[in-house]
Design a protein with these regions (language model features):
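Glycine-biased, small-residue-rich flexible motifs in mid-sequence functional cores and linkers
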Residues: 1-277
Length: 277
């Protein structure tokens, strides 16, 4: 159930402070019968998964998890593509004790756009999202944006004002309805399992949406168009069948997407081959 699923996300370049806070929040959530969801990446993700796996179940909750796993990792590629490679052992441990999840077919490579898709899945699976460390522009903020759109609660851990690793956290607290989280109890309370917290924006309930990142030329693409665009090489043009395999889409769909991308200046045809525009 979503009310027992807490997503914990943040920077790949986590500080010792960020890893410590993450471990405390993740372990407490699992001890109270919740599941910790993250993306399997380095930094905050890895710290969240490890703490969830190592957390001893509280005696009164050990027999009452109702099949809720301690942790779930959402992958950007296929389930047979352990990424990052340095986390293969960790991801196998997550698979043994919890779940690995992906909406990509086996063999699909993790690409930039698929990481953004993964963030959407993390937000959708969770009842609430906790952002521990995030830079000014980060995937964690992207996950928070999806969570706001889905009506999920978002909590943010503040950091030193001098730390670039917390700049995105402070931005969320200033510009969005995110809630300030300073203890593991407040993190769990995002799921409705504890006392109410003060809102962001100085403790007031904010009506502002999550901060928007600067627009990219690809921001308006459909999912299929984005997959085709990701499959296009930057320099060496490739035949359509290669693009079809990389994108994991049917040939007619790829051809239609290539035509639209070409009109938008995002794809270039070189004889019977294609590359990015």
């Amino acid at each position: 159930p979503a009310d027992r699923m807490l997503a914990v996300v943040g920077s790949r370049e986590a500080t010792a402070y960020g890893r410590t806070v993450t471990a405390r929040c993740a372990a407490h959530a699992v001890q109270q019968g919740a599941c910790v969801i993250s993306g399997g990446a380095y930094g905050i993700d890895g710290a969240a998964h490890r703490a969830a796996l190592q957390a001893p179940a509280a005696p009164e909750d050990a027999a009452d998890r109702d099949g809720v796993p301690p942790t779930v990792a959402v992958l950007a590629g296929g389930l047979d593509r352990f990424y990052p490679a340095g986390h293969e052992d960790l991801l196998r441990a997550v698979m043994a004790a919890g779940l690995l999840v992906s909406e990509m077919p086996p063999g699909a490579s993790p690409t930039r756009y698929r990481f953004l898709q993964r963030n959407r899945v993390i937000a959708a699976l969770a009842g609430a999202v906790l952002v521990v460390e995030a830079r000014w522009r980060s995937g964690a903020q992207n996950t928070a944006g999806h969570a706001f759109g889905l009506g999920r609660e978002v909590g943010v851990v503040p950091g030193p004002v001098t730390s670039p690793s917390s700049a995105g956290c402070h931005r969320l607290l200033q510009e969005s309805p995110a809630r300030l989280v300073t203890t593991e109890q407040e993190a769990l309370a995002l799921l409705g399992q504890g006392p109410a917290r003060s809102g962001g924006a100085g403790g007031r309930t904010s009506t502002r949406a999550a901060p928007e990142s600067a627009a990219r030329p690809t921001d308006g693409l459909t999912m299929e168009e984005a997959l085709v665009h990701e499959a296009l090489p930057l320099r060496q043009a490739v035949p359509v069948d290669r693009i079809t395999v990389s994108a994991g889409l049917a040939l007619p769909t790829v051809l239609a997407c290539l035509s639209r991308l070409q009109r938008a200046g995002l794809a270039e045809r070189v004889e019977d081959r294609w590359r990015r525009g």
